[in-house]
Amino acid sequence: EKKYIQIFDGYRGAYGVANIKNAYVDPDSGKLKLKPGDYRWNYEELKDNIYNEHLNGTKSIGIQPCNEEGETKFGLIDIDPANYEHFDKKFIIDKIQEYKLPLIPILSKSKGLHLYIFMRKFVDAAILKSFLSNLLPLFKLKSDTEIFPKQTQLTKDLERGGYRPGQFINLPYFNKTERRA
């Protein structure tokens, strides 16, 4: 659990909450969707016990990978295909292996793929995001494919204090078994 927390470290001033129990499958796209209010920021400090609740299956959480200094320890390409039924995961995995890319594919909650890259220490978020962006053509992905961290610099939140967290990414291994690599 300590290793998991070290790997998925980022902005700790707030964390995302995803109420997976109320999720439904969109009949048109096949994507798992959440109802309004079931996918939101919780403006409390992200402490180690919250990570443990995620791993134990009590609370599904997400994190903003970019910290207050504009650095990150991980990033990812979020592949949400137009048609999940005919999505060729093997093509993506074959490209990772062919080019010996430091990416780990993990199933997303909607059965797409998150292609993670992990760093030993915090690195400039803009540089990591640029690296991931440059990989999109290799995987035949559109230039508007989601890449996290979405924000490479957090801005001050004058109303709440602290920082505006931007967008979070749901963390894998909810209940220690779901969405494995």
Locations of regions flagged by a protein language model:
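DNA replication initiation on ssDNA origins
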Residues: 1-74, 82-92, 149, 167-168, ...
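Short acidic (Asp/Glu) and glycine-rich catalytic loops that position anionic groups and cofactors
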Residues: 28, 111, 177-181
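Sparse, context-dependent recognition of short Cys/His-centered cofactor- or disulfide-binding micro-motifs
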Residues: 62, 100, 156
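Short beta-strand
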Residues: 63-66, 103-110, 146-150
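Histidine-centered divalent-metal-coordination microenvironment in nucleic-acid enzymes
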Residues: 76-77, 96, 102-131, 162-174
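Helical (often loop-to-helix) elements that flank the catalytic cores of nucleotide-handling enzymes
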Residues: 85-98, 118-146, 177-181
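Catalytic "initiation/cleavage/transfer" segments centered on a nucleophilic residue
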Residues: 142-181
